[in-house]
Amino acid sequence: MMETSDLRLTRIPIKHGTGQMPALGFGTLIPDAALTIAATKDALEAGFRHFDCAERYRNEREVGTALQAVLAAGGVTREEVFITTKLWNSNHRPERVGAAFEASLERLQLSYLDLYLIHTPFAFQPGENQDPRDENGNVIYDRGVTLLETWRAMENLVDRGTSGTSDRDKSNRGKCRAIGLSDITLEALKPLYESARIKPAVVQVESHPYLPETELLEYCKANGIVFLAFAPLCHGMKPGLLEDPVIVAIAARVGKTPAQVLLAWAVQRGTALLTTPRSAARARENFDISVLPEDALDEINRIQTRQRLNQVVKTGVPGFIPKGG
């Protein structure tokens, strides 16, 4: 991690790739097109320089519109901004990876991506339908491709000048600076890491004090992988972390909001994070974090509640696990 006394400026070096990831990231999972554009601009204005996108979110074009408007206005350069997007489950077949990457680049109006992630380890029936279902409403998985085969195609995006792939794949080379995985367990990550020619640069998973993922975090640190936490505020679900007595008490003591306390904790433990403020005021709040004292970090680490909110690690299908699940 790049040492700085200002947590807002923390950048984490990409060891299995190039560049540095700003620890404070803006997640673009916003269903409304107009709100996506406005919120992305607000986040840039607040100071966010890390943006996490996905084919699945169906709003890459709007994110690109907002980003290009801000870049054109000056004050922010493309080199300052770290952009991630993700390969969706229905494009896991190796022959589909290059086209999916190229389509995301076009929608985002970019000449390169800082990071391209496999959105989940689960392959769905290949095709344009992002959510293929059978007559009983069950997801149709693709049993004809392995995660490692998809990873090899991801590696090809990073490579330069290797023969034996399609012209489309060759044209993408140099446009993908790093690759990684999202919604993966430690058990699934280990064998892929061992087999990978180009190691995963980043692993993105749900993580917060109710789901610290300590073992996965330590594995990532030991192997030069950036740990990127989504849902660091538990999606704002109530009752939840924002109302947790420990977090509320620390916030009052240090003069910050509960959200700011949770985001500072995430950065200070060595992770990057994603948050999705949908207003300018919330973007400014979420960006305005500062160092927590050691006793506050210890109190948060001692929280015993354990809860996973998102079931995607089990099925590849986005959604929330009901309480008690």
PLM features: what roles do these ranges have?
Residues 120-325:
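Beta/alpha (TIM)-barrel catalytic core signal, keyed to glycine-rich beta->alpha loops juxtaposed to Asp/Glu
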Residues 77-91, 115-121, 204-207:
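A short, structured active-site edge motif that brings together acidic residues
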Residues 24-34, 86-94, 139-143:
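Active-site mouth loops of central-metabolism enzymes
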Residues 1-81, 98, 156-163, 233-234, ...:
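N-terminal binding-site loop/beta-alpha segment at the start of enzyme catalytic domains
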Residues 49-57, 84, 177-180, 202-205:
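Short catalytic-loop micro-motif centered on adjacent basic/acidic residues
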Residues 18, 97-118, 157, 170:
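CE4/NodB-like, metal-dependent polysaccharide N-deacetylase domain
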Residues 13-16, 64-78, 105-109, 193-196, ...:
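Acidic (Asp/Glu)-rich catalytic clusters
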Residues 31-44, 93-108, 185-189, 212:
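Short, acidic/polar
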